[in-house]
Amino acid sequence: EGFAELRIPIVKDRPFFYDLTANGAVRVSDYSTVGTTVTYQAGLVWAPVADFRLRGTYAQAVRAPNIGELFAPSNQTFAFIDDPCAFDSRDNGSDTREANCLSLLQGLGLTDAQIAGFTGDTGTSLPGLSTGNIDLTEETAKTLTFGAIFQPTFIPGLILSADYYDVEIEDAVATPSANTLLELCVDAVSLDNEFCANIDRTPVGGGFDPADAGVVSGFTLQPKNVAAFSTKGIDFSARYRVPTEKLGIFNFSFVGNHLISLETQGTPGADIIENAGVLGDPEWQVNFDFNWTLDNFNLNYGINYADKTLRFSRADIAADPDIVAPEYLKVDSRFEHDVQLRWTTDSNMSFYVGVNNVFDQEPDVGLYFDPVSALGRFFYAGIRISGDDLGF
């Protein structure tokens, strides 16, 4: 692995150009599994005045598949098959599905009459294999960010910032289900694809029952570079530090995120799913912390907020508008308060007590971790002793 970084001051101390600086970096990595990868980033920072600056960055990053995704041993698994080549399913996919199914079944020796009435029904849970995939390649992420920082000299200790981000991940690693493999196989342009290679079918004369001709006899589930993700949002923060002569130091911190979109596509051609605002991915999250230090004492009070989220995916709600009573459609917002008091001795030994979830907010109906943990209000106390305190 090797890398290089570059910083180029372009203009400085000029009207409307207090600072203009370009920066860039490149990294080349050679993996024994996926070979050579290249990542890079380029950015620009412009400060028209000393108190205010704009910044932007474009970057490409990669993630090499991990050891489990590559080399997981084979294990048996089971699945119920819904064959896309059944006579009543051939027109429910891509424009090439019907032609591919005909070619596939003819290649197995089925007659026109058998193909016309083919159901693909195995009548039972079908055994298959789950294993790693040594042919995986790296995931690639492309990121665009731009934002602003305001640090006014007339209000010492105040820092305001906001950054917009746009991230797209291609060739993401995911493991298609058995039924998804079947659909991807025949919905592709041709049958010469990696998905068909993971499906076994019984040729004419190859089974104990003539009715098994053409039926799926086995499958192999493997991680593949088939998924895609994208997200957009805004990170924002405000920090204010107020030192005083007699009352100690006050620190205020306000950090948040607005999730504009979070789209996932599990496999090529699959529906794009919007997850922003769905359980686990709130559109708004904010953390506020107040910290006060006076001599050896420190007090911290924190508030963690997340807005309401849908209990079910938008696709599930669209398919069944009455999936749940209206009052349970959304999970309550999180408004958790935490407090801690710490005393540190002159020898750096510290004692602390605190309460998490001060007002004992509970999880929503039917949930254990949303919007808060089922643990409820939590009291704790402790002591921290370093080796120096013990004389070694």
Where are these regions (language model features)?
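Surface-exposed extracellular loop regions of Gram-negative outer-membrane beta-barrel proteins
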Residues: 1-49, 141-147
